[in-house]
Curated annotation (Swiss-Prot):
It is found in: Secreted. One of its GO terms (cellular component) is extracellular region. Plant non-specific lipid-transfer proteins transfer phospholipids as well as galactolipids across membranes. May play a role in wax or cutin deposition in the cell walls of expanding epidermal cells and certain secretory tissues. Transmembrane segments: none annotated. This is Non-specific lipid-transfer protein P4.
Length: 37
């Protein structure tokens, strides 16, 4: 099972960008990764 934390760690560049841009919360980025896995 892949946890949200593991996905967040793998997508840290994506999450960092989204958080800086302020358009999408990190949770949303994580959720997209889990749904596409």
């Amino acid at each position: 099972t892949v946890t949200c934390g593991q996905v967040a760690s793998a997508l840290s560049p994506c999450i960092d960008y989204l958080q800086k841009d302020g358009a999408v919360p990190a949770g949303s980025c994580c959720x997209k990764x889990l749904s596409s896995a």
